[in-house]
């Protein structure tokens, strides 16, 4: 029984390391990318994958004198937390390793602000193109670079997924008309009320 459990554990570790990962020492899920928003005044979890036993370091430009360090575990995963200050930006987040200086990820145009999940039934995904009051006027005036979307496409799976196919997008008229109208107006209201 112990041998079976060890074999399963090793197989899971191998799967985690090789499942869609590149041969670079560190790799991030899509949720951590350029234009992302991190929750302000919080401690935010950041995670990814890499070569086992590699030290991963993070430096956010909002706390330039603090370096956060963690290690990649035997299954090829790493996770750490980074503190955030009040709303602002744009910032950068550098993620790098000691043993391979050439492997440095720099995420750009990061905002610290409010992060909300907008989810629900089919009416939640209706875009302004499905018909809203003053549709064209709202679309034409949808230049809000501090409102960001991270929209997931519909994908089925029989097991939990560790990554997704999506990217952060700044709110422009072109982007706004394709995204959730409810999410857009909610984000716009938050921006007006909270000044973020």
Language-model features, listed with the residues they occupy:
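Bacterial Sec-dependent N-terminal signal peptides
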Residues: 1-23
């Amino acid at each position: 029984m112990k041998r079976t459990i060890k074999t399963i554990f090793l197989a899971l570790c191998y799967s985690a390391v090789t499942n869609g990962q590149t041969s670079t020492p560190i790799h991030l899920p899509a949720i951590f990318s350029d234009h992302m928003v991190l929750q302000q005044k919080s401690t935010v979890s950041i995670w990814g994958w890499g070569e086992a036993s590699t030290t991963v370091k993070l430096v956010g430009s909002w706390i330039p004198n603090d370096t956060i360090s963690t290690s990649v575990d035997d299954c090829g995963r790493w996770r750490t937390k980074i503190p955030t200050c009040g709303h602002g930006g744009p910032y950068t987040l550098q993620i790098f390793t000691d043993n391979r200086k050439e492997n440095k990820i720099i995420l750009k145009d990061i905002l610290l602000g409010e992060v909300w999940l907008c989810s629900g039934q089919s009416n939640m995904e209706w875009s302004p193109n499905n018909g809203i009051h003053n549709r064209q006027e709202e679309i034409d005036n949808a230049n809000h670079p501090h409102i960001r979307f991270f929209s997931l496409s519909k994908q089925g799976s029989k097991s939990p997924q560790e990554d997704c196919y999506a990217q952060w997008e700044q709110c422009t008229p072109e982007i706004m008309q394709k995204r959730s109208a409810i999410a857009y107006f909610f984000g716009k209201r938050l921006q007006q009320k909270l000044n973020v």
